[in-house]
UniProtKB/Swiss-Prot annotation:
Has antibacterial activity. Keywords: Antibiotic, Antimicrobial, Defensin, Disulfide bond, Secreted, Signal. GO terms for molecular function: lipopolysaccharide binding. One of its GO terms (cellular component) is extracellular region. Belongs to the beta-defensin family. Disulfide bonds join C28-C55, C35-C49, C39-C56. This is Beta-defensin 119. InterPro entries: Defensin_big_dom (IPR028060). It is found in: Secreted.
Length: 84
């Protein structure tokens, strides 16, 4: 019987306590997105996370696939060509 109590004590010490209502949020794309089974209305799915869920990014996020940091200056001159 003592062995059973010792086994239960060790098992409870190893297990992480379960806290209801709190879920670990898995982040993706350099902490810009959230891994979800389905994206919200204002989010776009982009690639997949480690748990095969969608990496959901806000629709206004710009993604550079070249790996280089882009200049994100949104001035008027850079958006439209100059008129002669």
């Amino acid at each position: 019987m003592k062995l059973l109590y010792l086994f239960l004590a060790i098992l409870l010490a190893i297990e992480e306590p379960v806290i209801s209502g709190k879920h670990h949020i898995l982040r993706c794309m350099g902490n810009s997105g959230i891994c979800r089974a389905s994206c919200k209305k204002n989010e776009q799915p982009y690639l997949y996370c480690r748990n095969y869920q969608h990496c959901c990014l806000q629709s206004y996020m710009r993604i550079s696939i070249s790996g280089e940091e882009e200049n994100t200056d949104w001035s008027y001159e850079k958006q439209w060509p100059r008129l002669p």
